A protein has these predicted regions:
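A detector for small-residue-rich transmembrane helices and their helix-helix packing motifs
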Residues: 1-217
Length: 217
């Protein structure tokens, strides 16, 4: 079994500290701690229930659901990916545009997941759809950047450098191959539809949010 963990972009230096990305990470951690304290009632109140969205109810959960997570590994993995790709996009777009872009991507991702199971009453949650939006923007803007990555195969661990286009491209292919699965608290599945929807939103709209000079081809 192989695991690949992106650690960050080594091809560029950001002009300023990624304050918004850090704020998003801190908010996710805070909300997760609230989940641990308040339990399942908190999750059901703020997570996306597809059947509710289908009937125009609890639309705020399209945002709040992106800050909920199903466990320690879920939130840890998401925050590592966000910190690997988020700072460069925040630096290129500017803080406010990046924040709006991230939140809108999360909403689009959740809507994609709802579209795949509109009658479900099982909570959908997680930041991965919004993070997929950031990754979509990254592959458009900085495809040649090298991503420092930790590769773990059985007992062998090493750090290597992988072109962003290859790393993100393979990741997206995996999402497409698994797009039939649904992420739920009960099943422990992965929201592949949300990933695909968020990623495509990032790819299509990245140019609209970012000055042309920020792109690196």
């Amino acid at each position: 079994m192989a695991t690949l963990i992106p650690l960050g972009d080594v091809s560029r230096r950001t002009r300023r500290f990624a304050m918004v990305t850090l704020l998003i990470v801190v908010t996710n951690v805070y909300v997760f701690l609230r989940e641990l304290v308040e339990g399942n009632a908190f999750v059901r109140r703020w997570a996306v229930i597809p059947a509710h969205i289908e009937h125009g109810r609890n639309l705020i959960t399209l945002v709040s659901g992106t800050f909920l997570h199903a466990g320690w590994l879920h939130i840890a993995g998401n925050m590592v990916f966000l910190w690997a790709f988020g700072p460069a996009i925040e630096d290129a777009m500017g803080r406010m545009r990046y924040l709006i872009f991230y939140l809108m991507g999360g909403v689009v991702a959740m809507l994609a997941q709802v579209a795949g199971s509109p009658n479900s009453h099982v909570p959908c949650l997680g930041a991965s759809g919004a993070i997929a939006t950031v990754m979509g923007a990254f592959i458009v803007m900085f495809p040649r950047d090298r991503i420092r990555s930790l590769v773990w195969i059985l007992i062998f661990i090493r750090v290597t450098y992988i072109p962003a286009a290859l790393l993100i491209g393979v990741w997206f292919l995996i999402q497409l191959l698994n797009v039939g699965m649904v992420a739920t608290v009960q099943s422990g599945g992965v929201a592949y539809l949300a990933h695909v929807g968020g990623f495509l939103f990032g790819v299509v709209t990245a140019r609209l949010w970012t000055p042309k000079a920020a792109f690196s081809y």
